[in-house]
Amino acid sequence: TTDRRWIHYINADGTRGKMRQFDHLPQGAKYQLFDDIRYTNHVGIDFYHRYKEDIALFAELGFTTFNTTISWARIYPHGVEGGVNQEGVEFYRNVFKECRKYGIDPVITLYKYDEPVYLEETYGDWTNREMIHQFVEFARVCFTEYKDLVDKWLTFNEINILLHFDVKEGKQFAFEELHNQMVAAAKAVKVAHEIDKNISVGCMIAGFCSYPYTCDPKDVIANYKEFQNKFAYCADTMVRGYYPSYAKRIWKENNVTLNISEEDKKDLMEGKSDFLAYSYYMSNVVTTHKDEGEALGGAGTSANLKNPYLTASDWGWQIDPTGYEYFLHVLNDRYQVPIFDVENGLGAYDKVEEDGSIH
């Protein structure tokens, strides 16, 4: 590595550790692929060394479910061909045992935008289908090693996030990566059920709750298509087991051609997600009226438009608890599977008082 890149690893609570020397990496894990785009290199809460006291505090608060992410690089630092890092396996076993000790049910994510750099250096990116095999074998080890401690798993965190933003490699690249990730997730579901029929594996989709900005029927249609484009495209495929009919519209609008094999279709159908997990932070508005704001592509969420009925956080994210209820109705009516909200919160400028309280 060079001074331009930090060595990153993900603590068991999802926060990212960051350092320059390889030999400081805990449990023999290789660094993960993140460019140096963060403001600070400070360690977050050092969960890796303090997980016992943190989990005890977590239990004291009365929480009974804990979602965290396993670092792929800590289990397979050099890919399947390099073998399993047993120290990494034991670290997570100890974390999950500590959770169970306090009656906390761990809900574990396998992938949160990270993979061992070895895989990127060797195979490139997720457009290479070898990544499917690598991920499935990583999942197999996790399901096997922790089946006595973990019975609820998530495959890819916010798998649809590529559809929310423009990526420099282009839409074709994004949709190819996404397809391979959804196939990998489906194959992982199948593996989990083969290992233990009591294991449940869900998909995790970034929530997209939005309203038409006006009652113009064109805004209503635009809003519905945005929901299809940014949320349902992935959720429909992973929960129902096949691409929805409107996927053809999305591919055409984005000039995308996917090579979907019959084997891929079979895997998607046989590896349907057992439950649907999602994140919810805010709601958006959608309009076709360019004079109302900066609509994306003529129909989309607008960075400049705000819902006049809602307040916003210090960062401009609109606060919408009613939207939370509305979105749950939408998901329940559409999918009819168990639903988990695994990310939700509000950013604020906090002040630590002299007595240690935070306001």
Walk through the language-model features, giving the residues of each.
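Aromatic-lined carbohydrate-binding/catalytic grooves of carbohydrate-active enzymes
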Residues: L61-G88, I108
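Catalytic domains of carbohydrate-active enzymes, especially glycoside hydrolases
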Residues: D46, R50-S71, E270-L276
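Active-site mouth loops of central-metabolism enzymes
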Residues: D36-R50, D125-E130
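Active-site region of glycoside hydrolase catalytic domains
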Residues: T1-D35, H78-V80, V89-I358
